[in-house]
């Protein structure tokens, strides 16, 4: 797992400015744009899993990204239901410890959801994202997914830097953070499946 690489790969793509700006523009298009973001990041995850040297996708499959985003939405909702129920029960009581446990479960569950996205990205079939292997992959490779979770915290903090530039700044840094999180998730999935992450290309 390489958190630094998950961040730096964006800037090693010759067309990264255009690709990130288009990703940022999608934030301003309600629903359709947000779904396209989901489909685009799904392609990014697949590229990392497949070992593509420059995994940041080209913006050349708008319809496919929209359809992929719908699949991401369905997978996210279905896998979100168990943790929503558990956290609702834990948060119902006025107990700080149960609240802390609820938070930990929510954080940990993000790894399970990324594991499901990896199956969806690799197979393209939404049914592949709904099996116990999604959970087992995380449990059997827990150290790898801990690094993924830590990385998402780092990228989340980075995205807040954009607040300095107000709305435009935050969507740019958020777009980079989304790409970095997808890359790290692809790394975690690939390593969990027993494949080494390819060496970083030199430019």
Kindly give the residue locations of the regions a language model identified.
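Short helix-loop boundary/capping segments at the starts of domains
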Residues: 34, 50-54, 72-75, 79
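Selective recognition of hydrophobic, aromatic-rich stretches within alpha-helical transmembrane segments
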Residues: 27-50, 91-129, 152, 156-196
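Interfacial aromatic "cap" segments that immediately flank transmembrane helices
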Residues: 2-27, 59-85, 111-161, 185-187, ...
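Generic alpha-helical scaffold signal
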Residues: 35-39, 56, 60, 64
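Membrane-helix interface/capping segments
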Residues: 46-60, 86
